[in-house]
């Protein structure tokens, strides 16, 4: 039987995500971001609730991406997630994309020319952002042209790189409905961005996601819920460059801007440049919020939930892969657990995210 991996945020889970799961074949394993996500934001609802949504709508097993995989640029995000899914025995990686390309062919190209392609990146001007450099690399070596406004396509190319040399088949699924960044409400498949933007519209939410009631009754957060804490962190941290990926230039820009702005969005607008994209700045600000420092990634895989089929699969691989199903006196990943504790500060109604939590079990055999 096919074992399909899916890398996701489900922020929040919507009809387009259900479509992706419906189109995927065989056993479906999701590697999902935890309480902070790749574009540099706190997840609107917590990881356990999002895992439950996925399991109730087609996923068989949901595992957590460690913080330093989940909150990273596309290449590191993809590489870390594929590493985890490979440990779980996937043979196919399914993903949504705005552009239908031969991603398996692109993966083969990268597998043969990785050294030359990486070397090419080092020859490009420093003023270019990493996404811009990546775009030029793919144009030169594979004739692929795209813009920075198609994040799912950018991730798909990162998946092609991450799967190079592995026995994992790439299965792109054409994205349905609104664009990733769209806030449009009239389309059949609304984007996660639109759902976050219009979360106070119950009728829109109800038609746009399969778990509307669970979403609407769950504690929700945005960056503004953490802005005061972020201000405190920036103002009291004597040397921001001690934190993960904060260089001297960014530290100066952030220290200066934090005294001039009154909202998180203003802060991002003030700090971002052509070189430092808004997504990168948001991720940097999360590192500062959490107090993140570079650390090694955990070798164990943390389980958020499973169905009966997912539990059976775990029993088959338990002697090959180290599984964490409950975090107690022994930590799983200290930085992820630190991030969870900060996440809980955003809303007093958020339940405990780490200690003693056990995987969600969904019986969908009927």
UniProtKB/Swiss-Prot annotation:
EC class (word): ligase
Xref: Gene3D superfamilies: HUPs (3.40.50.620)
Recorded family membership: Belongs to the TmcAL family.
A GO CC annotation given for this chain: cytoplasm
GO molecular function: ATP binding; ligase activity, forming carbon-nitrogen bonds; tRNA binding
Superkingdom in the source lineage: Bacteria
Biological processes, Gene Ontology terms: tRNA modification
The entry's keywords: ATP-binding, Cytoplasm, Ligase, Nucleotide-binding, RNA-binding, tRNA processing, tRNA-binding
Pfam families: HIGH_NTase1 (PF05636)
Protein name, entry field: tRNA(Met) cytidine acetate ligase
Species annotation: Streptococcus mutans serotype c (strain ATCC 700610 / UA159)
Residues given in the record as ATP binding sites: 7-20, 96, 152, 175
EC number: 6.3.4.-
Catalytic activity annotation: cytidine(34) in elongator tRNA(Met) + acetate + ATP = N(4)-acetylcytidine(34) in elongator tRNA(Met) + AMP + diphosphate
PANTHER family: TRNA(MET) CYTIDINE ACETATE LIGASE
Record's function text: Catalyzes the formation of N(4)-acetylcytidine (ac(4)C) at the wobble position of elongator tRNA(Met), using acetate and ATP as substrates. First activates an acetate ion to form acetyladenylate (Ac-AMP) and then transfers the acetyl group to tRNA to form ac(4)C34.
Subcellular location: Cytoplasm
InterPro entries, alphabetized: Rossmann-like_a/b/a_fold, tRNA(Met)_cyd_acetate_ligase
């Amino acid at each position: 039987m096919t074992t399909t991996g899916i890398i996701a945020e489900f922020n929040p889970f919507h009809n387009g995500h259900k479509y992706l799961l419906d189109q995927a074949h065989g056993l479906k394993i999701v590697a999902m971001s935890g309480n902070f996500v790749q574009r540099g934001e706190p997840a609107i609802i917590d990881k356990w609730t999002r895992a439950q949504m996925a399991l109730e709508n087609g996923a068989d097993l949901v595992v957590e991406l460690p913080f330093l995989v989940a909150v990273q640029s596309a290449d590191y995000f993809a590489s870390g997630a594929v590493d985890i899914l490979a440990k779980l025995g996937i043979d196919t990686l399914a993903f949504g994309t705005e552009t239908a390309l031969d991603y398996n062919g692109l993966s083969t190209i990268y597998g043969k020319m990785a050294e030359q392609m990486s070397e090419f990146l080092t020859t490009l001007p420093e003023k270019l952002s990493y996404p811009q450099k990546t775009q030029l690399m793919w144009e030169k070596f594979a004739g692929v042209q795209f813009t920075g406004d198609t994040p799912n396509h950018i991730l798909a190319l990162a998946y092609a790189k991450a799967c190079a040399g592995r026995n994992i088949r790439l299965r792109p699924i054409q994205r349905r409905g609104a664009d990733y960044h769209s806030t449009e409400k009239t389309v059949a498949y609304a984007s996660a961005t639109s759902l976050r933007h219009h979360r106070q519209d119950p009728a829109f939410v109800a038609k746009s996601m399969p778990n509307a009631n669970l979403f609407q009754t769950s504690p929700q957060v945005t960056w503004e819920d953490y802005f005061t804490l972020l201000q405190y962190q920036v103002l009291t941290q004597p040397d921001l460059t001690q934190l993960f990926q904060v260089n001297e230039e960014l530290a100066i820009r952030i220290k200066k801007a934090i005294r001039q702005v009154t909202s998180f969005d203003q802060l991002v607008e003030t700090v971002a440049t052509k070189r430092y994209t808004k997504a990168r700045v948001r991720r940097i600000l999360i590192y500062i919020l959490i107090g993140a420092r570079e650390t090694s990634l955990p070798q164990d895989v943390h389980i958020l939930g499973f169905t009966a089929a997912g539990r059976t699969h775990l029993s088959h691989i338990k002697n090959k892969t180290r599984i964490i199903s409950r975090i107690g006196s022994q930590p799983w990943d200290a930085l992820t657990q630190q991030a969870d504790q900060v996440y809980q500060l955003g809303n007093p109604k958020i339940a405990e995210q780490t200690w003693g939590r056990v995987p969600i079990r969904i019986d969908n055999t009927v």
